[in-house]
């Protein structure tokens, strides 16, 4: 491995398995460091493509999303770092795929628990092809003022406190990602800060070792001293001991191996990492610390003394003129996210949508304040749900049963009506369910199913103004307006619409008042004197009876009733009901595998 610097201020990465927060932290670090280009060139989300919006300072940017590693590498040939946030189950396969890409030079594997046999294969391939693996089980790494991997160094506040927005003179490597954050802070307190920091990961077989990075730091001119934080278990530290003995490291090394307390336990102890377990004497923290000290590293007597050892080593280098003071800079402030600012009470922002009928912010959705569990446990019906979501109140059971009756009676009226016909033709053209449904719904209007609202409006206006049926009908005639809710293509005086009869019978039995329906029947009596088919149709029946429901229930003010009729609630009832039938016709045609519909010539009048 050896060589030298693996990151720079122009390094770009590909991020595998989209995670919003780690990517945003990388971009915030970029802005803090004054980078001109974002460090994340592209995102790989298997099976997906498009863009993800994130912030680069104050500016919102779109980062490309690619479905495969190969596609991402081809699209971003200058991105040579692969940050793998895959789970331990797929981390090995995706990492190997990345290593095989000619443009990828460094692979960071975040997942913990990658099978050791898979890790060995990755290590073997990387070494044979002169590539670098950081991890598995790592938080990543950072080059101060230039580039960082994922969540390395934590929050922006911590990064600023540790002075990671500009380079220092210390190269740092550890096994533990959590302890690396602590050490960045320690090093910043007693030196001019780190130049580069790496957490190799706590698994038994790390992709790169402590000595790999120390030897690399030794070749970086800007790194004047190194700090190593090892841990008990394994023999990784001994490769560093050999490098020190052989004179391969010419810069001061301050080292400490944690886990000296393991001797206090009578049996083998497993600490946080897979590789951090007490084994034989050679793997103990005491033995490693002694070996490092004998090889020439500066090893304190305890972890508490590590900070002093780092400080003294750094100050000696300054005295010897090997380190020049770093020019301190003031990093730019990172704009605070709106959500964070609102949560902390720093700003207030207007909302863009008002919703009064449902709320999904709690443990369960609520319809007009009624929890979903209550709706199910108390046996609410579809009519009850409509009363909550449409009328924002729980209507009496006779009202909700009437609503359900309207839905059942209007669900379908055969394949010959315009709505069903359109859905059938569309379905037979091979279109999808939604297209077929909408095709039928778009025929609903003044001539088909959409007269309920108008019937209610005109009947209400006439009744409230005390117009006689004669005055009402003749007045409409003078205006050139057909009376909505009156007339049928098939039904007549002698062939009444059964649906109308059922609705009227229910209302007479359950409604406290049917004044609007009785008025509509009086109008029907007058219109039947003119023509045999001018009967009260289902639109007129529902329209007039809904007026009786609203006024008779005592739960709506006059203003609310006028608003409900004006908005179009009653046509909404027909739209909801007829959707059931239109969906049924669509499924029926598809189930029967009916061919494309073509209207027969003999049913067309061709004329000039």
Curated annotation (Swiss-Prot):
Gene: ACLB-1
Entry protein name: ATP-citrate synthase beta chain protein 1
The keyword DNA repair is assigned to this record: no
Chief site of localization: cytoplasm
Domain of life: Eukaryota
Active site: 273 (tele-phosphohistidine intermediate)
Family according to the record: Belongs to the succinate/malate CoA ligase alpha subunit family.
Pfam family, one: Ligase_CoA
Keyword terms: Acyltransferase, ATP-binding, Cytoplasm, Lipid biosynthesis, Lipid metabolism, Lyase, Magnesium, Metal-binding, Nucleotide-binding, Transferase
Enzyme class name: transferase
Chain segments annotated as transmembrane: none
Source species of the chain: Oryza sativa subsp. japonica (Rice)
Molecular function GO terms recorded: ATP binding; ATP citrate synthase activity; lyase activity; metal ion binding
One GO CC term, this protein: cytosol
Binding of Mg(2+), residues: 231
Job description of the protein: ATP citrate-lyase is the primary enzyme responsible for the synthesis of cytosolic acetyl-CoA, used for the elongation of fatty acids and biosynthesis of isoprenoids, flavonoids and malonated derivatives. May supply substrate to the cytosolic acetyl-CoA carboxylase, which generates the malonyl-CoA used for the synthesis of a multitude of compounds, including very long chain fatty acids and flavonoids. In contrast to all known animal ACL enzymes having a homomeric structure, plant ACLs are composed of alpha and beta chains.
Record-listed E.C. numbers: 2.3.3.8
Binding site for ATP: 214-234, 265-291
Location within or outside the cell: Cytoplasm, Cytosol
Quaternary structure note: Heterooctamer of 4 alpha and 4 beta chains.
Protein's GO biological process: acetyl-CoA biosynthetic process; fatty acid biosynthetic process
Cited InterPro entries: Cit_synth/succinyl-CoA_lig_AS (IPR017440), Citrate_synth-like_lrg_a-sub (IPR016142), Citrate_synth-like_sm_a-sub (IPR016143), Citrate_synthase (IPR002020), Citrate_synthase_sf (IPR036969), Citrt_syn/SCS-alpha_CS (IPR033847), NAD(P)-bd_dom_sf (IPR036291), Succ-CoA_synthase_bsu_CS (IPR017866)
Substrates-to-products reaction catalysed: oxaloacetate + acetyl-CoA + ADP + phosphate = citrate + ATP + CoA
Residues given in the record as CoA binding sites: 292-302
């Amino acid at each position: 491995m050896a060589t030298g610097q693996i990151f720079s201020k122009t390094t770009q990465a590909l991020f595998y398995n989209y995670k919003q927060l780690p990517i945003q932290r990388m971009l915030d670090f970029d802005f803090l460091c004054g980078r001109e280009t974002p460090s994340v060139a592209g995102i790989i989300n298997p099976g997906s493509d498009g863009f993800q919006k994130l912030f680069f300072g104050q500016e919102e940017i779109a980062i490309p999303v690619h479905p495969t590693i190969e596609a991402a590498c081809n699209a971003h040939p200058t991105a040579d770092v692969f940050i793998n946030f895959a789970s331990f189950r797929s981390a090995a396969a995706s990492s190997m795929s990345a290593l095989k890409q000619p443009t990828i030079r460094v692979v960071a594997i975040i997942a913990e628990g990658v099978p050791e046999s898979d890790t060995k294969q990755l290590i073997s391939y990387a070494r044979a092809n002169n590539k670098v693996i950081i991890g598995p089980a790592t938080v990543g790494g950072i080059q101060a003022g230039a580039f960082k991997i994922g969540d390395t160094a934590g929050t922006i506040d911590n990064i600023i406190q540790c002075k990671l927005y500009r380079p220092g003179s210390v190269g740092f490597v550890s096994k533990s990602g959590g302890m690396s954050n602590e050490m960045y802070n320690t090093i910043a307190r007693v030196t001019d800060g780190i130049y580069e920091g790496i957490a190799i990961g706590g698994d038994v077989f790390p992709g790169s070792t402590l000595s790999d990075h120390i030897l690399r730091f030794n070749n970086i001119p800007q790194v004047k001293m190194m700090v190593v934080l090892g841990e008990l278990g394994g023999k990784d530290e001994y490769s560093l001991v050999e490098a020190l003995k052989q004179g391969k490291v010419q810069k001061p090394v301050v080292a400490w191996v944690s886990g000296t307390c393991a001797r206090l336990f009578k049996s083998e102890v497993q600490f946080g990492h897979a590789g951090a377990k007490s084994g034989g004497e050679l793997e103990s923290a005491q033995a490693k610390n002694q070996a490092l000290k004998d090889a020439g590293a500066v090893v304190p007597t305890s972890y508490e003394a590590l900070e002093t050892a780092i400080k003294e080593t750094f100050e000696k280098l300054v005295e010897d003129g090997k380190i020049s003071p770093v020019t301190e800079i003031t990093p730019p402030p990172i704009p605070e996210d709106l959500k964070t600012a609102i949560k902390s009470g720093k700003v207030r922002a207007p909302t863009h949508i008002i919703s009064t009928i449902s709320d999904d912010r709690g443990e369960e959705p609520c319809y007009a304040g009624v929890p979903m569990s209550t709706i199910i446990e108390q046996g609410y019906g579809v009519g009850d749900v409509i009363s909550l979501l449409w009328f924002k109140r729980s209507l009496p059971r006779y009202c909700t049963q009437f609503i359900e009756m309207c839905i059942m009676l209007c669900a379908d009226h055969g394949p010959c009506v315009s709505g069903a016909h359109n859905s059938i033709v569309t379905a037979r053209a091979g279109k999808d369910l939604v297209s077929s449904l909408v095709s039928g719904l778009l025929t609903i209007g003044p001539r088909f199913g959409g007269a309920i609202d108008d019937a209610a409006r005109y009947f209400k206006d006439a009744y409230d103004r005390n117009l006689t049926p004669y005055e009402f009908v003749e007045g409409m005639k003078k205006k050139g307006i057909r009376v909505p809710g009156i007339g049928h293509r098939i039904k007549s005086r002698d062939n009444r619409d059964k649906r109308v009869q059922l609705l009227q019978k229910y209302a007479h039995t359950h409604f406290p008042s049917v004044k609007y329906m009785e008025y509509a029947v009086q109008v029907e009596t007058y219109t039947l004197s003119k023509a045999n088919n001018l009967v009260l149709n289902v639109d007129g029946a529902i329209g007039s009876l809904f007026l009786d429901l609203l006024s008779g229930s005592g739960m709506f003010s006059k203003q609310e009733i006028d608003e409900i009729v004006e908005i179009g609630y009653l046509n909404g009832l027909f739209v909801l009901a007829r959707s059931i039938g239109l969906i049924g016709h669509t499924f029926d045609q598809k189930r029967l595998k009916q061919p494309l519909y073509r209207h027969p010539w003999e049913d067309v009048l061709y004329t000039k």
